[in-house]
C-alpha cells in the first residue's frame, strides 16, 4: 500500500549518526493532511484519495470549495492533491508523518526554483567560446544546424526560460521522523524553494 503526505520545505541542515557519519538532510514540515474525498470506480471512474494541506482563510475560498471541505468538517485548504493505491481512509480522517519511519524509501515531488530567462550555457551546460579579445564567440548558442533544411530543428539548445518545472526525485531515504513537530527529515536535497509544496509518497522503484 502506498504512503503519501503533503508538506512544506523548511530548508536543509545536517545531522550526525551515532557512528559519527555526517548526513545532509532536507527538513519538511507536514502538518496533518485531511482526507477531503475518497474516489471510487463507481462514482469517479478511478480510485484515489484526495487530501488537503495548509489551512487558508475562508474569505479566500468560493462557495463550492467551502462546501467541498465542509463534508470533511475542516477549513479550506491551500493545496489539494490526490494519492492512488491508498486504502482504509475515510473522509475527515487525518494523515500524519507517523506513517513513515526511518529507513523508508520515498519519491519526492516539488517545483524547481525559477531562474528566469537564461542563456544556453547556464540552461543547457554548453561550453563557452574563448574569452580573448580577438574571439568573436563567447557565450552564443553556436551553430543553428546545416543549411539544407532551411530551418532550425526542434530540440536545439537555445536560450529561454529556465526552472519552475515539476520534478520528482526518486528513491530518497527517510532519515528521521519527528511526530511531535510534524517534521520529516529526508536524506539529500529535494526540488523547490523554501516554503514550497512538497509531495512525499512511497517509492515506485524501490529495491525489494
Curated annotation (Swiss-Prot):
Keywords: Ribonucleoprotein, Ribosomal protein, RNA-binding, rRNA-binding. One of its GO terms (molecular function) is rRNA binding. GO terms for biological process: translation. InterPro entries: Ribosomal_uL3 (IPR000597), Ribosomal_uL3_bac/org-type (IPR019927), Ribosomal_uL3_CS (IPR019926), Transl_B-barrel_sf (IPR009000). One of its GO terms (cellular component) is cytosolic large ribosomal subunit. PROSITE patterns: RIBOSOMAL_L3 (PS00474). Residues 116-146 are annotated as: Disordered. It comes from the Bacteria. Part of the 50S ribosomal subunit. Forms a cluster with proteins L14 and L19. One of the primary rRNA binding proteins, it binds directly near the 3'-end of the 23S rRNA, where it nucleates assembly of the 50S subunit. Belongs to the universal ribosomal protein uL3 family. This is Large ribosomal subunit protein uL3. It comes from Streptococcus mutans serotype c (strain ATCC 700610 / UA159).
Amino acid at each position: 500500500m502506498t504512503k503519501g503526505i503533503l508538506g512544506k520545505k523548511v530548508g536543509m541542515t545536517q545531522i550526525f549518526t551515532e557512528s559519527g557519519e555526517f548526513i545532509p538532510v532536507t527538513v519538511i514540515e507536514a502538518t496533518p493532511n485531511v482526507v477531503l474525498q475518497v474516489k471510487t470506480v463507481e462514482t469517479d471512474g478511478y480510485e484515489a484519495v484526495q487530501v488537503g494541506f495548509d489551512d487558508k482563510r475562508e474569505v479566500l475560498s468560493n462557495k463550492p470549495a467551502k462546501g467541498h471541505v465542509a463534508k470533511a468538517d475542516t477549513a479550506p485548504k491551500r493545496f489539494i492533491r490526490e494519492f492512488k493505491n491508498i486504502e482504509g481512509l475515510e473522509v475527515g480522517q487525518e494523515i500524519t508523518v507517523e506513517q513513515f519511519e526511518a529507513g523508508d524509501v520515498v519519491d519526492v515531488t516539488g517545483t524547481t526554483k525559477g531562474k528566469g530567462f537564461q542563456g544556453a550555457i547556464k540552461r543547457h551546460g554548453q561550453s563557452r567560446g574563448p574569452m580573448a579579445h580577438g574571439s568573436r564567440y563567447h557565450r552564443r548558442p553556436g551553430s543553428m544546424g546545416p543549411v539544407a533544411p532551411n530551418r532550425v530543428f526542434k530540440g536545439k539548445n537555445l536560450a529561454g526560460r529556465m526552472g519552475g518545472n515539476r520534478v520528482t526525485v526518486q528513491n530518497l531515504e527517510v532519515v528521521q521522523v519527528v511526530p511531535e513537530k510534524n517534521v520529516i527529515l529526508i536524506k539529500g536535497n529535494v526540488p523547490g524553494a523554501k516554503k514550497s509544496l512538497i509531495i512525499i509518497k512511497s517509492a515506485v522503484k524501490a529495491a525489494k
